[in-house]
Amino acid sequence: MARFYRRRKFCRFTAEGITHIDYKDVELLKQYISDNGKIVPSRITGTSTKYQRQLATAIKQARYLSLLPYTDNHQG
C-alpha cells in the first residue's frame, strides 16, 4: 500500500527574508485571501505566527483603503 506524504509547509516570508509585509503590495496579499474574501489561516498556508499577524493587519489596512475587497463580487 502506497503511503501519501504531504509536502511540508514552510513560511514563504522567512525563506525569502522579508521583514515587513506592505499593505500596498496587493498582488502578494491576494494570494492569502480566499475566493470569498476571507483571510486564509496559517495552518493552510504554512505562514509563521509573526508573519500571519502582519499579513492580517496588512490585508485589513488594504481593505480599509479600498485596495482589496471585503467580500467577493456577488453575482445574482
From Swiss-Prot:
InterPro entries xref list: Ribosomal_bS18, Ribosomal_bS18_CS, Ribosomal_bS18_sf
Ribosomal protein is among the record's keywords: yes
Gene Ontology molecular function: small ribosomal subunit rRNA binding; structural constituent of ribosome
SUPFAM superfamilies tied to this protein: Ribosomal protein S18
GO cellular component, one term: cytosolic small ribosomal subunit
Transmembrane segments: none
Keywords linked to the UniProt accession: Ribonucleoprotein, Ribosomal protein, RNA-binding, rRNA-binding
Keyword Endoplasmic reticulum: no
Pfam families recorded: Ribosomal_S18 (PF01084)
PROSITE patterns named among the record's database cross-references: RIBOSOMAL_S18
GO BP terms, alphabetized: translation
Subunit structure: Part of the 30S ribosomal subunit. Forms a tight heterodimer with protein bS6.
NCBIfam families named in the record: S18 (TIGR00165)
Free-text function comment from the UniProt entry: Binds as a heterodimer with protein bS6 to the central domain of the 16S rRNA, where it helps stabilize the platform of the 30S subunit.
Family statement drawn from the similarity comment of this UniProt entry: Belongs to the bacterial ribosomal protein bS18 family.
UniProt-recorded name of the protein: Small ribosomal subunit protein bS18
Species of the source: Psychrobacter arcticus (strain DSM 17307 / VKM B-2377 / 273-4)
